[in-house]
């Protein structure tokens, strides 16, 4: 879909989204863009698991998802975080509809590794027609990253990779990862623009660390001929003003422009 932007909001930044974030989304819509939101919820899931005394562990950066963990993930992502985010959009005058990847079979999924990761899935198909229906009705879809297998089994999907899969499926011309920092930083200084090759080297050199690693890897994997650039932006300050993006632009290659 032309003029479509997929924005992924990490769970750690949801409580810090400023009025400037919503103003940026509003600006996009005023300029005729379709906006799709995908959100995480890791911190809230972690809190609830602790409260309910449900054991959880991470394997290669992904939360191993047993049946007990999956029940909590569903409850927190779709029941709490999704509705809170939809309410925030409404408070800023933006029409949003909360939807899980399970609803309407929006995100079809399969297990990545049932033995090591349990019910953690990868997206295999996206119901593009469902998103098109919501966008045509002038809504902002706010998607919690759960998927459903062909047998009806629900899967926990990493929000970064879900956003990339959705962007590719609907033919978005922009994908942005919203964080609590201005973008990629090197020695405290914002990297305004970098090629995929440069970013891969920064990963190898240990310049990119912690929670930024999965976001950057998802950004790199989302790059394609159809989506030659991806943004990493802040949710605390305006990230889009008067047609200009603020943050780090990762390009597939030198000179790759939309």
From Swiss-Prot:
Which InterPro entries has this protein been placed in? AceGlu_kinase-like_sf, AcgluKinase_fam, ArgB, Asp/Glu/Uridylate_kinase, Glu/AcGlu_kinase
Q: Which CDD domains match?
A: AAK_NAGK-like (cd04238)
The entry's keywords: Amino-acid biosynthesis, Arginine biosynthesis, ATP-binding, Cytoplasm, Kinase, Nucleotide-binding, Transferase
| GO terms for biological process, alphabetical | arginine biosynthetic process via ornithine; L-arginine biosynthetic process
Reactions it catalyzes: N-acetyl-L-glutamate + ATP = N-acetyl-L-glutamyl 5-phosphate + ADP
Q: Which domain of life is it from?
A: Bacteria
- GO molecular function, one example? acetylglutamate kinase activity
Site positions (Transition state stabilizer) are: 8, 215
The Enzyme Commission number assigned here is 2.7.2.8
Of the GO CC terms on this record, one is:
cytoplasm
Query: One Pfam match, by short name?
Result: AA_kinase
Q: What pathway does the UniProt record associate with this protein?
A: Amino-acid biosynthesis; L-arginine biosynthesis; N(2)-acetyl-L-ornithine from L-glutamate: step 2/4
Q: What is its main location?
A: cytoplasm
Q: Which residues bind substrate?
A: 41-42, 63, 156
Signal peptide residues are: none
Q: Where in the cell is it found?
A: Cytoplasm
The function of this protein is: Catalyzes the ATP-dependent phosphorylation of N-acetyl-L-glutamate.
To which protein family does this belong?
Belongs to the acetylglutamate kinase family. ArgB subfamily.
Q: Would you tell me the protein name for this molecule?
A: Acetylglutamate kinase
Organism expressing this protein natively: Geobacillus thermodenitrificans (strain NG80-2)
């Amino acid at each position: 879909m032309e003029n479509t932007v997929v924005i992924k909001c990490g769970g750690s930044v949801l409580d810090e989204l400023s009025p400037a974030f919503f103003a940026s989304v509003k600006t996009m819509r005023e300029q005729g863009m379709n906006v799709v939101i995908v959100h995480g919820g890791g911190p809230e899931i972690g809190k609830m698991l602790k409260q309910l005394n449900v054991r959880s562990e991470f394997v290669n950066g992904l939360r191993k998802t047993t049946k007990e963990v999956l029940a909590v993930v569903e409850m927190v992502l779709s029941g709490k975080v999704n509705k809170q985010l939809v309410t925030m959009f409404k408070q800023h005058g933006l029409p949003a509809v909360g939807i899980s990847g399970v609803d309407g079979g929006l995100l079809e999924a399969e297990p990545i590794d049932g033995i090591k990761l349990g019910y953690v899935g990868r997206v295999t198909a996206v119901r593009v027609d469902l998103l098109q229906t919501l966008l045509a009705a002038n809504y902002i879809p706010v998607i919690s990253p759960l998927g459903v297998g062909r047998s009806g089994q629900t899967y926990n999907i990493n929000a970064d990779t879900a956003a990339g899969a959705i962007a590719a499926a609907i033919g978005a011309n922009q994908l942005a990862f919203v964080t609590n920092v201005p973008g990629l930083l090197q020695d405290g200084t914002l990297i305004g623009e970098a090629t995929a090759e440069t970013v891969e080297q920064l990963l190898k050199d240990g310049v990119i660390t912690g929670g930024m690693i999965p976001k950057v890897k998802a950004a790199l994997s989302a790059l394609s001929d159809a989506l030659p650039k991806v943004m990493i932006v802040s949710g605390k300050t305006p990230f889009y003003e008067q047609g200009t993006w603020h943050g780090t632009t990762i390009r597939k290659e030198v000179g790759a422009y939309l």
